[in-house]
């Protein structure tokens, strides 16, 4: 049985070192201008080459995110970005927009393409379509249960990747327009403002129940205890979310995932101290989708 890859987020050079020295098998980082975390310290052509050299010298793979939707006017700059990524020696590109995937196939066909979670692939048919389009891996939607992950993984014919730790979208990744609607900042363009993390007033709660709570904010996903199950299912990679977080967070999350993969105990309190929105949830993978996944004890649907 192949060992599941631990894939760590990188949003700065400090996070890169933290991920590598903590033992990550691979890292993913954004190329400036075309990735879903514009607020991170993203990489240009020169710094990407340095990052790839640093990682490859230590046996760590590098996946580059070009995973925003792209405007037609941006295609010339996108072509330059793809050429820079290919020249860097990166191991794969993560993309959402099919225009990006098509251009990669034309400009750098040797570069493996991974379908971003922003594509919302949540069925076997969706994964098979990506295979037909030449993708070698699909990052499955975070909203899937373990049986759904198993079904897709066993029958899709390409690698699957699952989020194992980090933030959850209150909608479905790639389908939320709340930030764009309320503040003109699109998650699909890499600039989600996270309005779901704010407190909201609920007027329909029973008398005496506080109404102004974080009704829309989900707890962070943490399914490190399920790494052995995902590995047994044949999932290729376990992904840690968090390119906007800190080197300390990356180190804690990678260390916990390595321990979980090997069946060793890990310090859950250390994970909470590194970053936690009032605890963790594994509700999606467990198939238990309810109000306990949210920050507020009183959920708007209760």
Predicted features and spans:
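RNase H-like DDE/DDD metal-dependent nuclease/strand-transfer catalytic core used by mobile genetic elements
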Residues: 104
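Alpha-helix capping/helix-boundary segments
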Residues: 99-100
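Surface-exposed amphipathic alpha-helical tracts and adjacent flexible/coil segments at the periphery
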Residues: 1-21, 26-36, 51-52, 58-68, ...
